[in-house]
């Protein structure tokens, strides 16, 4: 049964959905809490659609993770991160390819993706988010994908830009 996955449908609701989905053997969840019998009987499919969309958004938990600024050099990146530290107290921390100022601002040491920089959006389940967004017609640049030691996807950029910014997903 090591390769078996389950889809529970009983006892699931908006408040416990994530706890079910956190278990690696659960592939999906369903249940009448999204498609209530009285709504079906009344033909209120717009309300069913709304509940289902809310469930998907709750599951994926999209949040702004950070904004990336493209600098032209290590010195410029360090100075930019230091400026945020002086302004707001966002502690500057140097990494391999960037500096972070707190958790909300990343300053790249050399220009990277995005004309103006990048925006990172975090999600509870990056693999599910990629599948969902691909179904909506969005594309990912898998050459940018980053994986952890267990080969789990941790980050990936979308193709293209939004408002001059590259956008990438990151696993919470």
Question: Model-flagged regions — what are they?
Answer:
Residues 25-48:
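Glycine-rich phosphate-binding active-site loops on the catalytic face of alpha/beta enzymes
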Residues 1-2, 12-27:
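Catalytic cores of alpha/beta
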Residues 5-10, 27-31, 67, 119:
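Hydrophobic faces of well-ordered beta-strands that scaffold small-molecule active sites
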Residues 19-20, 54, 132:
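Well-formed, non-transmembrane alpha-helical positions, independent of function
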Residues 1-3, 49-59:
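Alpha-helix-loop-beta-strand connector modules within alpha/beta enzyme cores
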Residues 68-106, 128-135, 146-157:
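Core segments of cupin and vicinal oxygen chelate
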Residues 56-81, 114-121:
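N-terminal beta-strand motif that seeds the catalytic metal site of vicinal oxygen chelate
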Residues 49, 105-109, 134-172:
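Vicinal oxygen chelate
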């Amino acid at each position: 049964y090591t390769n078996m996955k389950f889809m529970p449908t009983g006892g699931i609701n908006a408040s416990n959905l994530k706890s079910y989905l956190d278990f690696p053997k659960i592939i999906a969840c369903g249940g009448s809490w999204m498609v209530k019998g009285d709504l079906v009987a009344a033909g209120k499919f717009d309300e069913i659609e709304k509940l289902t969309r809310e469930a998907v958004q709750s599951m994926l938990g999209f949040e702004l993770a950070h904004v990336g600024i493209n600098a032209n050099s290590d010195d410029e990146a360090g100075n930019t991160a230091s400026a945020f530290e002086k302004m707001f107290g966002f502690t500057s921390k140097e990494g391999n390819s960037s500096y972070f100022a707190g958790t909300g601002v990343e300053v790249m040491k050399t220009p990277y993706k995005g004309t103006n920089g990048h925006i990172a959006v975090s999600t509870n389940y990056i693999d599910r988010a990629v599948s969902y967004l691909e179904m909506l017609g969005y594309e990912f640049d898998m050459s940018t994908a980053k994986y952890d030691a267990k080969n789990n996807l941790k980050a990936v950029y979308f193709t293209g830009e939004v408002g001059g910014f590259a956008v990438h997903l990151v696993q919470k």
